[in-house]
């Protein structure tokens, strides 16, 4: 936006002297001024099926973790008691605010059912190469509209070009690309996906999801293992079975119970509270000398002391 200030260097950040620095990742330059606030990239769904979800890894960078709901808060509160050098505030996820607006919660009135196909960028989990042929068949066999929207990190030109070509050849297909488009999510009646974190975000709109070989299938999904099962699964999802939709609502509430569009405001309130009283009684953060050296090397910032 024209009224925003963009800081392009470490020195500009330091001169700006922020009260707080927010990041969706799991690291932050320790030499930036202000309270270090973790907002998270997504929810703890552990899509890669790792032994321990990196969502909960504590590296000693942050003063404040703004958690989303019970799925993250309960674990972080345990870590807060164990570590003692940060505070946890359950605020809800700022990005969730867009999904619970009155405009987004009203379903689009589609003449024909609309399927949003989205896929993760993770090579071992992406369904894009495996489902292209079946999706093309369904474009002919079913009276459905399709929207193709991929994760921004999915950059394989062969995959993207194939779906671009499909969209140009079939009038009932639209290619959005490897970008996030909330409008496309609002237009869709159902999502077809694999193990992308966007599944949960789509469910915030109270819509069903069909997955292909999901890494953590549950009763809130219709998961299939073979391409030929996709069509019947989508047909079932479009009927919005009561049991499925109950599971969807329970699952989303566990991750994100804050539906008042004030998650972003609560984050700012959390920073104010931390500055006023939340910092009292905290231990010092770990020295992290090696990590700090690596951080300075990454940003080419060498003033001392570290």
Task: Give the positions of each predicted feature.
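Active-site and donor-binding regions of nucleotide-sugar-utilizing enzymes
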Residues: 1-101
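Short acidic-hydrophobic, aromatic-tinged amphipathic segments that line or gate anion-handling sites
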Residues: 4-10, 173-178, 221-236
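Donor nucleotide-activated moiety binding/catalytic core segment of transferases
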Residues: 8-14, 156-203
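Hydrophobic/aromatic beta-strand patches that form the interior of the parallel beta-sheet core
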Residues: 22, 37-38, 64-66, 89-91, ...
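A donor-sugar binding/catalytic signature common to diverse glycosyltransferases
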Residues: 26-40, 178-221
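Catalytic binding pocket for nucleotide-activated donors in carbohydrate/polymer assembly enzymes
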Residues: 59, 84-85, 165, 197-259
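Conserved catalytic-core segment of nucleotide-activated headgroup transferases in glycan assembly
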Residues: 89, 94-164, 259-265
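C-terminal amphipathic helix plus adjacent low-complexity
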Residues: 238-306
